[in-house]
């Protein structure tokens, strides 16, 4: 995605096993009932000013849907590139990941600057993990020294689900992430980890909010 918009000639794909991957805007047109069932359900109820701002301006982003019992063979790779010539820009990407019961998937997200201009991105991600779903999400930040990103991640997990999120911040003037997790089903397990390698003049800040709503849930958290 370039500046928050999908530029591919084929913005959305659906495999034989029902997996849907690609542009959120394209998914909303092709599968409106599916997207409407989940879109903004978490950000609206749990969100803050960041999610509210994104909801107002968001037009596109990434969409991942893995049906019940499907094990995705390859990771879903999502690249957000930020590019401008001679002017400062802002983007508002919105991402929606849905993992149905018994599914397995891996998602790799890259946020990178493709020019030396100033860029500001306000990004929101909603993740739904149904019963016994397994999802690993790795997010990498590589921005230039003039660009910033603020993001909100909202995850809802049902019984016996497992979600592992790893955020790696390498470069960027400001990288701020708020991660909200709701463990709503018995036996749900969450891992929220981060590795921040900041230099002079850089600020990286992550906050986490993990709610053990159901009993016998487990959460682990490591940030360095």
Regions found by a protein language model. Give the residues of each.
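Conserved beta-strand/loop scaffold segments within soluble protein domains that form the structured core
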Residues: 3, 7-224
């Amino acid at each position: 995605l370039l500046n928050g918009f999908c530029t591919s000639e084929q913005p959305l794909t659906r495999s034989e096993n029902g997996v849907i991957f690609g542009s959120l805007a394209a998914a909303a047109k092709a599968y409106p009932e599916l997207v409407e069932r989940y879109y903004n359900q978490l950000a609206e109820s749990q969100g803050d000013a960041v999610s509210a701002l994104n909801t107002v301006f968001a037009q596109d982003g990434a969409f991942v849907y893995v049906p019940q019992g499907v094990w995705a063979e390859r990771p879903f790779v999502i690249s957000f590139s930020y590019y401008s010539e001679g002017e400062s820009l802002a983007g508002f990407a919105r991402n929606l990941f849905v993992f149905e019961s018994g599914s397995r998937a891996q998602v790799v997200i890259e946020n990178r600057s493709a020019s030396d201009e100033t860029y500001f991105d306000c990004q929101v991600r909603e993740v739904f993990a149904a019963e016994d779903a397994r999802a690993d999400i790795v997010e990498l930040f590589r921005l230039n020294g003039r660009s910033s990103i603020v993001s909100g991640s909202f995850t809802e997990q049902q019984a016996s689900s497992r979600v592992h999120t790893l955020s790696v911040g390498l470069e960027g003037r400001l990288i701020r992430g708020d991660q909200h997790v709701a463990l709503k089903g018995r036996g749900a397990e969450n891992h929220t980890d981060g590795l921040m390698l900041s230099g002079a003049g850089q600020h990286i800040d992550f906050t986490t909010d993990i709610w053990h709503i159901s009993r016998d849930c487990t959460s682990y958290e490591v940030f360095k």
